[in-house]
Amino acid sequence: AIALGQSYLNIKKKKIKLEMSQAIAAVGQIHLAGEFQKLFDKNKFKSGQILITPDDTEQRRRALNVRRTFDNLFKLKAIPIVNENDTTATSEIKYGDNDRLAARVAQIIGADTLIILSDVDGLYDKFNKNKIIKKVLKIDNKIYDLAEKKINTYGSGGIITKLEAAKICMNAGCNMFLGNGKKNGALERMIKTKSYTHFVPKISTLHAREKWIISSLSSSGKVYIDNGAARALMDGKSLLAAGVTKVMGNFEKGENIMIVDEKDKNLARGLSSFSSLEIDKIKGKQSGEIENILGYLSKSEIIHKDDMVRL
């Protein structure tokens, strides 16, 4: 939208202030939607536009609203065209790439497959430039080491954002395929030649709420816990204040945070029942002491087991 707006307004500057780029995006967005509609009209398809910011996917209530909008567009037999809302997104709070945006949308709407089209035939082994890694079952350091990390090789987002997108999909039980969209008949060609990388999802037993928690783009903070609390977590228990030893980050009640053990190993993610300031006051304390310390008691658990996904 920004690039199209610059072209329409005949702005040739490469460095533009955030406030101005948001206004330029507003101009470009109209023309971008118009171009899409022309293409769909030629083939007698209806379409609708959804503009998204991270707030729309990272806040649970708003994510559910996004899903309802998609569901209703499908009922209307209209194809959703999704883009980041560059008119309101800031440099601090934005996706900045379509890979993770697409994966998060796929997770929210419960899609079984996401196809990302780039300018290459798949994920290449950097030690053998002619070899495409056909199937990825797990994204770990080996995959990051194998992958060529040049941004311009895999489009604007680069290979890192594509691997992050694949992680989101795999955790949500969604297949992801990476292939070449630069050639005519891209999807048909991918199927016929099998020129793609398939990121195979885990067999997911998670509920939609749990998928949303684990697929969050980032955690707002961390709480460190002792060994006793770590064992309780692995037994399926909630996290209590008594087991918390340290808080890192600045977050509010309801935000997605990481639970970490004494060896700095990530154990779980969950929605905090308290802000970081509140947890700092009650860490190491018994549940019965919370009301006296804070002056009120909303919940006795730092993170309830139903709001937590173990990693």
Model features per residue range: what roles?
Residues 1-311:
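C-terminal catalytic "cap/lid" subdomain
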